[in-house]
């Protein structure tokens, strides 16, 4: 349930992981138990209930599930409460023993503790869920990071953007090609493509952030593009996916100069891009983004890094909304256009806002 409630805010869900991952994150984040039921009331046992429990405790300190259920029926309490009562009763017993005679209690303690732990773990079912969820959340968040670009961003996979990007790019280009091309307009389709790239992509996302720093270097860009793939979710995935490491350079150049399409010069390859910019959209099979491209086109023709052959249409959602800035800083702001709404306004810090 939590995930559903929360998902809307986290656009990441595009990747899918997001839902659960976010969920998990939440508990650790700050509202530990709220999504669950509020605190359980303190269970008060009546004298008759205590008598039944104590009688069983006298028989065995570690009643099995069947015994616990039987007693639970007798005293009309959930089995979980019975389990917890036994756990606490054993602890009390142990404490008394320790205070009474430290030496004797130790062996007992040793014996009981392992068992106790096991029963404890079961009982923890009731208590620990929060803890569990948080731990799960952290782990899941980590895993999700891999899956979600957004998460990844958080995770800061950026570490070796280049490597990741490069690796991604190659496969990406190929894989993306086919699917992406299919849906010019459909970001979703692209999404699907990216997903395969998903894990790497996220990495790329991170890289992207890193790349942003390194934006100047064309190479970094390629990576970032790779990340783009992961972005695929929101953006016309194709663009991201397309950013094969290869062409990225071209795009990059263009990107940073939307206004100076030919600034591509930085990337020789981009030169092609420069020319095609306008047309490429059409050509690229991956035109998926083309729908977007169009919008983008207007803004930045060169964007279509048509040259890139990868159908990364600049349209790919890289709007260089701030041309001047973009030009100034090689770091291109990839503002993913409308669909993507990712405005990398801050080139330096790309926020991967997953929508």
Swiss-Prot record:
Principal cellular location given in the protein's record: nucleus
Classification via Pfam families: Homeodomain, TF_Otx
Skewed-composition ranges (Low complexity): 115-144
Database matches in InterPro entries: HD, Homeobox_CS, Homeodomain-like_sf, Otx1_TF, Otx_TF, Otx_TF_C
UniProt note on tissues of expression: Brain: restricted regions of the developing rostral brain including the presumptive cerebral cortex and olfactory bulbs; expressed in the developing olfactory, auricolar and ocular systems, including the covering of the optic nerve.
Biased composition (Polar residues): 94-103
Residues of the signal peptide: none
Cross-link (Glycyl lysine isopeptide (Lys-Gly) (interchain with G-Cter in SUMO2)), chain numbering: 345
Subcellular location: Nucleus
Keywords attached to this entry: Developmental protein, DNA-binding, Homeobox, Isopeptide bond, Nucleus, Ubl conjugation
Entry's Gene Ontology molecular function annotations: DNA-binding transcription activator activity, RNA polymerase II-specific; DNA-binding transcription factor activity, RNA polymerase II-specific; RNA polymerase II cis-regulatory region sequence-specific DNA binding; sequence-specific double-stranded DNA binding
One GO term describing the cellular component: nucleus
Chain's role: Probably plays a role in the development of the brain and the sense organs. Can bind to the BCD target sequence (BTS): 5'-TCTAATCCC-3'. May play a role in the specification or differentiation of neurons in the deep layers of the cerebral cortex, and also in cerebellar regionalization during early development.
Family: Belongs to the paired homeobox family. Bicoid subfamily.
Protein name: Homeobox protein OTX1
């Amino acid at each position: 349930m939590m995930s559903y409630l929360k998902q809307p805010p986290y656009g990441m869900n595009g990747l899918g992981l997001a839902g659960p991952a976010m969920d998990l994150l939440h508990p650790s984040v700050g509202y530990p138990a709220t999504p669950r039921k509020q605190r359980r009331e303190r269970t008060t046992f009546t004298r008759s209930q205590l008598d039944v429990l104590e009688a069983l405790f006298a028989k065995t300190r570690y009643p099995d599930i069947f015994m616990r259920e039987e007693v639970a029926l007798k005293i009309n309490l959930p089995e979980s409460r019975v389990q917890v009562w036994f756990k606490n009763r054993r602890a009390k017993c142990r404490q008394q023993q320790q205070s009474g005679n430290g030496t004797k209690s130790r062996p007992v303690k040793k014996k009981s503790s392992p068992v106790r732990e096991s029963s404890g773990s079961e009982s923890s079912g009731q208590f620990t869920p929060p803890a569990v969820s948080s731990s799960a959340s952290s782990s899941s968040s980590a895993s999700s990071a891999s899956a979600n670009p957004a998460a990844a961003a958080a995770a800061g996979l950026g570490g070796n953007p280049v490597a990741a990007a490069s690796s991604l790019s190659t496969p990406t280009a190929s894989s993306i090609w086919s699917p992406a091309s299919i849906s010019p307009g459909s970001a979703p389709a692209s999404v699907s493509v990216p997903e395969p790239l998903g894990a790497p992509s996220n990495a790329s996302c991170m890289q992207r952030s890193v790349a942003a720093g390194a934006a100047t270097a064309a190479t970094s860009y390629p990576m970032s593009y790779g990340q783009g793939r992961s972005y695929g979710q929101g953006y016309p995935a194709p663009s991201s996916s397309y950013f094969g490491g290869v062409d990225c350079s071209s795009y990059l150049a263009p990107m940073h100069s939307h206004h100076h399409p030919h600034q591509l010069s930085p990337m020789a390859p981009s030169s092609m891009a420069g020319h095609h910019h306008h047309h490429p959209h059409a050509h690229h099979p991956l035109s998926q983004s083309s729908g977007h491209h169009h919008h983008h086109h207007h803004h930045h023709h060169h964007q279509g890094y048509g040259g890139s052959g990868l159908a990364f249409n600049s349209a790919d959602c890289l709007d260089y909304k701030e041309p001047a800035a973009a030009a100034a800083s090689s770091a291109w702001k990839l503002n993913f256009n409308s669909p993507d709404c990712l405005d990398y306004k801050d080139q330096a810090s790309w926020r991967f806002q997953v929508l």
